[in-house]
Amino acid sequence: MAEALSQVGNIGGQPYWSWYGFEGRVEWCACFVSWGANECGYIENGIIPKFAGCVNGVQWFKDRGQWADNSIEPTPGMIIFFDWDSPNGSSGSQDGLSDHVGIVEKCENGIVYTIEGNSGDACRQRQYPVGYYEILGYGIPAY
C-alpha cells in the first residue's frame, strides 16, 4: 500500500508502462497495479499477476477462486476492477468486461477508497460507494 501511495501525483504513467515492456504510452492502470505488485515481491510470489489488460487480471483471480462481486465491503489491498462500458455503447447495464483497475486503500462507512493509475492520466486517490454499479468486483490476493 505504501508503495502505491508514494506514486500519487505521477502524471503520464512512467515508469509503469515502460517497466512492463511497452515502448510508448498505453492505457496504464493495470501496468501501475502490476508495477506496485512487483515492487513488493507479489508477482514473484504468485500473489498478484503481471497484467496489462484488465480482463486478464479479472480472469487470473477468478481462475484461482479469489474473486468477489461488487456487493462486498472490500479490505485494504484488494484489487478493484471497474466496468465502465455498456454493450454496444448503449445505455443501461454494463458489458461485464473490466475497463479499469486500482487498489483498495480502505473501506469506511460504506465508501471504498482507492489508489488508481491512469485516472485522468495520473495516479490518484478516488472514492466510490460500496456496491457502485461501475465496480465489477474485486481480486482477493492471498497475501
Set out the residue ranges of the language-model regions.
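...with weaker cross-activation on analogous glycine-rich loops/strands in unrelated enzymes
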Residues: 43-121
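Intrinsically disordered regions, especially transient/low-confidence alpha-helical propensity segments
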Residues: 14-16, 25, 32, 57, ...
